[in-house]
Amino acid sequence: MATDAQMAQVAELEVEMMSDMYRRMTNSCQAKCIATAFRESELTKGEAVCLDRCVAKYLDVHEKLGKRLTSMSQGDEAALQKIAQQ
């Protein structure tokens, strides 16, 4: 059973990973969608649409990777349990 310290460490790692993903997504989508020479104080419609699509794709890929890694991890755990039973 996981201790409170272990649970706190897991929660801290999750926050760190989400912060890193947000930072990378922000940097990537801003570089892709927003010109470096600002001509207007507000986002143009094209920039807003580009950012929306970029963020949606980034989150979709992040979710798919998370599901895939979870299924791989569960498969590894099952294999280890089989080996331990032998």
Swiss-Prot record:
PANTHER family, alphabetized: MITOCHONDRIAL IMPORT INNER MEMBRANE TRANSLOCASE SUBUNIT TIM10
Per the record, the gene is: tin-10
User: Tell me, how does this one assemble?
Assistant: Heterohexamer; composed of 3 copies of tim-9/tin-9.1 and 3 copies of tim-10/tin-10, named soluble 70 kDa complex. The complex associates with the tim-22 component of the TIM22 complex. Interacts with multi-pass transmembrane proteins in transit.
Q: What is known of its domains?
A: The twin CX3C motif contains 4 conserved Cys residues that form 2 disulfide bonds in the mitochondrial intermembrane space. However, during the transit of tim-10/tin-10 from cytoplasm into mitochondrion, the Cys residues probably coordinate zinc, thereby preventing folding and allowing its transfer across mitochondrial outer membrane.
Report the protein name in the record: Mitochondrial import inner membrane translocase subunit Tim10
Highest taxon of source: Eukaryota
Motif Twin CX3C motif: which ranges?
29-54
The protein's matches in InterPro entries, at most eight in alphabetical order, are given as: Tim10-like, Tim10-like_dom_sf
Q: Which UniProt keywords apply?
A: Chaperone, Disulfide bond, Membrane, Metal-binding, Mitochondrion, Mitochondrion inner membrane, Protein transport, Translocation, Transport, Zinc
Q: What is the lineage of its organism?
A: Eukaryota, Metazoa, Ecdysozoa, Nematoda, Chromadorea
Give the family, as the similarity comment puts it: Belongs to the small Tim family.
Q: What the protein does?
A: Mitochondrial intermembrane chaperone that participates in the import and insertion of multi-pass transmembrane proteins into the mitochondrial inner membrane. May also be required for the transfer of beta-barrel precursors from the TOM complex to the sorting and assembly machinery (SAM complex) of the outer membrane. Acts as a chaperone-like protein that protects the hydrophobic precursors from aggregation and guide them through the mitochondrial intermembrane space.
Q: Name one GO biological process term.
A: regulation of multicellular organism growth
Q: What happens when the protein's gene is inactivated?
A: Worms a small body size, reduced number of progeny produced and partial embryonic lethality due to defects in import of proteins into mitochondria.
Location of this chain's protein in the cell: Mitochondrion inner membrane
Disulphide bonds annotated for this chain are 29-54, 33-50
